[in-house]
Amino acid sequence: MGQATSNIDPQEKRDIVQEFTKEELQTLFYHRCLSLLKPIEVAFLKQDLNGKTSVTADDLGKLFKFPENTNSFSEGTLNILYHVMKLIGKFPFINNNNLAIEETLSFEELVVSLVFFSGRYKKIFNSDYDFLKLLFISLSDRPQTKDSKTIDEKNVDPGTEKFKTNLIVALEEEDKQELRARKINWSKLDVIKDFDHTEVQQLSVNAKRLQDMTTLCLILNAIVRHNHDAIQKQLVEYSDRWREFEVYSLYLLRYLDVYLELDKLENQKISYDSFSKGINGLLPYFFQINLNRMVCDSLLSSNSPMATKPTEEHNDSTESTPQKKHTFPKFQETKVVSIPFLSYVSSMLQGIGNPTILSPSNLVKLYAGSEAGFSIRSLETKIFKWQAPTLVVVSGKRLKSKTMQTNRRYQKFDEMYPRHFLASENHLRDWQHESDRITYAVLVNQPWKSSNKNNFGDEKSIILSISPRADYFKSVHSSILQGQSIYFNNLGMGLGFGNNQPLNKNDTKRFIPGDMSLTIEANLEFAVFRHLVNSSSSNDKFFHNSQQSHISHEDYEDRFTISTIEVWGLLVSGKELEEQKKQWEWEEKQAEARQNVNIRNLGEERAFLEMAGLVGNHGAAGGSM
């Protein structure tokens, strides 16, 4: 007849639990990591070690092929990297207080840390394992004592303490270490889930230490990966420019804490909350990606996809083709747009989920005020021919109170730009300084056009704060506005990003700035970035406000005199690229034709060309030099 129902919990029936000592778990985890390296990688790693069973901080520099005889990879940076790898190498028992005593990194610790740096740990744990928390713990300042407090309280011998461990499949007596390690469900181990009982909220990271780590990752991010020799050459070259990358790493860290100051970093601390919110908000994959590159460029390069000879062969065949193919001008750095700048901006774009890639190979300089003149007409002739996305970069010094009170050109602009702050108010927040250099960049997805009546653009436009701190302002999704946030007004009102069309009729000129907007006046001399979150204006809102924790609810402005303005074209692929090449080639032919005209004897015609911004007199108007 009927059968008796079972009272055994199905989950309980499935779970297989076994106890291991700390030493046993560490050994098994090492073997699990070792199984994730290819035999050839292990062989090359041992070869690089020359029979050594442990390495020092200096040895690490050689293993990672860091350049020697340079001040860039200082002893401090290598020591930071060593300390991080030492702690991660102790995994899963990372709440270890004896690290300061140990001066070498064992082979086992090296293997474990390489697995985490390379991202292969994802094959061991669930996809939600928090690598950033582990990195923060490894970088943090912690009191160094000889014994763990937890063990002292329990009066347990650390060598005999047992840890309950879930198994996927029961262990067999004849199982080798690698197989035993594979049978453990590491994600369910309590010591892994709570990071070995680490009270992360009580920890902090020294700001200078985090800056060094960030600078190293920016350099690694800048390297274009073609082949091993090219990688090494770039690593040496960019390492010599450590100070340039270091400046941008400070800007990035100011997204974590806006109060960080260059000359106080050694004594400033970053809490876990600031680190977690800031990094996850701006650079969620930055450290993992670039530590992976560091490992794959050197020790585990056999697993790194490299561009090979076929690329060169393709170039050779192209040269032998009778038809001459147009090539764009080779990238040359400017005062603002440099290799460190591109690495910095690319890291930001990648972090906020923007697919745009910025590199020396896909950028063409269309306009630079220092070369073509600070003229709206000159700007128009240079950028309107580009039928692909562009990057606008505008930079200068923050306007000082004295300049605002005495400069007549600024006062004329100020009359047209409606004030939000009262004249009697201190217009600077406590994290803004009069000596700041201000730089903003705008990614414009659509081609430029004259827009004296209606805005243009789409929701892929984005405003980036470059200096003195990193920030971003994405387009608002709206079926009504449709991202049409940009105007190029050649009738005396300049450029606007996030503004409504300016009023310009019956001798009345007035800007209508949005609450999140960047306005550049017609002489390309002054600019204002406005960030208002407590405004009651009825103006359209084209861009989201800052998500930075200190700033997201603050009203502020950056008013600055422009010393540099540049527009760079982005090279796209496919049909658009071919059309752009044809357009560029036609423009070059027209330019050559103009050069053949004897403009010295043109008289009135020369004056006309000057007004059009095509020849001469570019420096006569606009731009604060």
UniProtKB/Swiss-Prot annotation:
Chief subcellular location: cytoplasm
Protein name per Swiss-Prot or TrEMBL: Restriction of telomere capping protein 5
Residues covered by the TLDc domain: 335-571
Signal peptide: none
Renumbered residue ranges of the record's region Disordered: 305-327
GO cellular component, one term: cytoplasm
Keyword Cytoplasm found: yes
Protein localization: Cytoplasm
Function: May be involved in a process influencing telomere capping.
Name of the gene encoding the protein in the UniProt record: RTC5
Pfam families in alphabetical order: TLD
Family indicated by similarity: Belongs to the RTC5 family.
PROSITE patterns in the cross-refs: TLDC
Keywords assigned by UniProt, alphabetized: Cytoplasm
The organism of origin for this protein: Candida tropicalis (strain ATCC MYA-3404 / T1) (Yeast)
